[in-house]
Structure formats: structure tokens, C-alpha cells
């Protein structure tokens, strides 16, 4: 509201539309995971081994992007409900058709931790498939591939998701209770400590 009142709202930082935009991006990623990595699709017709490596990289990038968009949604819309439970966001783990999307009751909010677990699983898959770095002058895996996800980028996003999930503000009320601005009470030290150790 402050940003809107001060004239700081632009087409690039307007929160209206974030939900649908992110789920559209997730649908593109899921469509690619389901259709873009099959044997019928070739990215290098002259060398089957290079084609295989490209597909592995693209699969890793897809898992990275799916985790990225879920995390963006989680940062904006995840949090505690009135009942004290930390809620996540509906997970898009497959391509969602218009008919399926029309069934609003089918998309329930999992817990915050279940959402983080989904994100972390996608990032673990990405870490396995992505290259460490892009170096050399190779057309597909060389240093001209600027801005592509790497193992390190996936590991950083994973650590951030785990850090957010360990925050006292994102714990159920039976683990931590917020008592004021920046103040909280730990009700279940074992669970609280375990989340921080996971980071």
C-alpha cells in the first residue's frame, strides 16, 4: 500500500497478477518436463551423446525453475493461518489443464513444510543434473551460456528455502509462538532445532 501511495508501483513490481503469472510459468515448466524430454524430441541430431547431455541439463533447469516459481509463491502467499498452522501453496507437480484448473476444490494448500520439502526435492534433482559451471568454448556447455542455472545456484536456492522454513515465523504455533515484533517463544525445542540443523 505504501509503495502504491508513493507512486512506486510499476508494471515490474505490481503484486497483482503474481499468483496467475507464477502458475502459468509452472504450467510451462511442467509441460516441458512431460513433453520436451521424450525420445521424439532431439536437440542435437548429429551426436546422440550431446543430445542426451542437453536433455539432462534441460531437465535440471526445469526442476530448478519449478522450484524457483514455487518458492516465489511461497514467499508471497505462504504463512500462518488463523489456527496457527503454517500453510504453503498449492503444488503444481504436473501440467494442469483448463478443465482441471476449473476444479478449484482439487487444489488444497499443504503445510508450509510440505511445500518446502517439494521445493527441496526439485532442487536435489536439479543439483544432480546441472553442470557445475559453464566454461570453455563449447556451444552448449561453454561460457557463452550466461544466466543458466548451475549446481551452485540450485544449492543456494535450496539453502534459502530451508532457511525460510526454519524461521520462527514459519513454524506451527505448537513449535514457536510469535509474542511480538521480532520476539517469539520456543514451545518445541527439538523440532525447532532440527529445522535449523537442516539448513
Where are these regions (language model features)?
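Aromatic-residue-lined binding/catalytic grooves and analogous aromatic/hydrophobic interfacial grooves
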Residues: 1-5, 30-38, 116-140, 148-199
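Conserved, well-structured interaction surfaces
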Residues: 2-79, 102-142
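Short coil/linker segments at helix-helix boundaries
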Residues: 46, 77-109, 169-197
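Extended hydrophobic secondary-structure segments that form protein cores and membrane-embedded regions
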Residues: 59-63, 91, 154-155
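Hydrophobic side chains in beta-strands
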Residues: 69, 93, 161-163
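Short, solvent-exposed turn/loop segments enriched in Gly/Ser/Thr/Pro and often Arg
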Residues: 81, 146-148
